Amino acid sequence: QQQYVCTATLIDWASRAPSSAQRHTRYQTVGRFAEHVHLEEPRHELPPPNHFGQRKTRRVPRIYTALEIDHLVLAAAQLSAGDPRRPQTYATLISLLAATGLRISEALHLRYGDVTPDGLLIRKTKFQKSRLVPLHETAAAGLGQYLAQRRPMPLATDHVFIDDNGQPIGYGTVYRIFARLARAAEIPTLRGHRPRLHELRHTFAVRALQAAPAGRQRIGQHM
């Protein structure tokens, strides 16, 4: 067992990380620690900066306020033109994304059989795994009201969310509608960037962590 920070050992350990982001995190974290302890004990080696190259800076995500989410849902409920089902469809979709942290792809792939008394069964997620996402009683009630009107429709698809033509909603349609909702809700740009749909997922994650100590367990179930 090594007593001092060793650059070669750090590089080997960081290289074993499952992703490039985690590799950089491991390397930079130990590197900062080494800078601190090296002042008192020079036998701690100082790893060279950016050994794995300069990490690409990610855009800082927007965290929506509760009021902004309310305004998005209200704007959805007031959608006009097209299918008269559109307002309830998008109000329910936005509410569900905000309440569960689902990816938009996961929400759009939901089928009747995925809505269970225990929550939403998310099949073959981004990492090809399935998980059960619990629903708060208010979210379950809202989804139930939507399904009460959706199920009787004599359509060929059993997807939960459908477009004006009775087909599963496409990504492009959702993003166009969301941009429209964000403008109607008067949500401002942030650091030059317009509001994004995926930031509802970031918002859910942050709110869940703020609800500690139960937050970490809750976010794990949803993500």
Predicted regions located by residue number:
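Conserved catalytic core of the tyrosine transesterase superfamily
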Residues: 1-223
